[in-house]
């Protein structure tokens, strides 16, 4: 299977969620199933069926996270030689030269991407267009809205 790039922070968030699911939610669901069984007939026991459904979702998410972590290529940006270029894990300040709108993006793995937090996937058009360029460069990027010119204002590695 293909290794998936992931930042240290992204891997840590997944480990925290996995820990919560295994050590808090899973035991709670098992307790709920046990209590629901005590209420008698399981065919018409809504509490039992709800708890079993919740157990299925929990176990599925545990397997999904374990698989992601197993296949992750965790990249510590602080240990990379970057030559001041935009690379995976970098935080990049850009200005749209057509609108003068300024924005900062962190380039992360697919599973970490969250536009509300200004975290874009390494596979997004903007990230692909910025990779390999330096502060001060002007890049043309094909986006779903058409070609956009960006000036790279700042590149940070944290």
UniProtKB/Swiss-Prot annotation:
Signal peptide location in the record? none
GO BP annotations, alphabetical order: DNA-templated transcription elongation; regulation of DNA-templated transcription elongation
| Record keywords | DNA-binding, Transcription, Transcription regulation
Q: Which residues form each disulfide bond in the chain?
A: none
Does this UniProt record's set of keywords contain Ribonucleoprotein?
no
GO molecular function annotation: DNA binding; RNA polymerase binding
InterPro entries for the chain: GreA/GreB_C_sf, TF_GreA/GreB_CS, Tscrpt_elong_fac_GreA, Tscrpt_elong_fac_GreA/B, Tscrpt_elong_fac_GreA/B_C, Tscrpt_elong_fac_GreA/B_fam, Tscrpt_elong_fac_GreA/B_N, Tscrpt_elong_fac_GreA/B_N_sf
- One Pfam family of this chain: GreA_GreB
Record's keyword annotation contains Transcription regulation: yes
* Highest taxon of the lineage: Bacteria
| Cited function | Necessary for efficient RNA polymerase transcription elongation past template-encoded arresting sites. The arresting sites in DNA have the property of trapping a certain fraction of elongating RNA polymerases that pass through, resulting in locked ternary complexes. Cleavage of the nascent transcript by cleavage factors such as GreA or GreB allows the resumption of elongation from the new 3'terminus. GreA releases sequences of 2 to 3 nucleotides.
**Similarity annotation:** Belongs to the GreA/GreB family.
Q: Which NCBIfam families match?
A: greA, PRK00226.1-2, PRK00226.1-4, PRK00226.1-5
Query: What protein am I looking at?
Result: Transcription elongation factor GreA
Highest lineage ranks of the organism?
Answer: Bacteria, Pseudomonadati, Pseudomonadota, Gammaproteobacteria, Enterobacterales
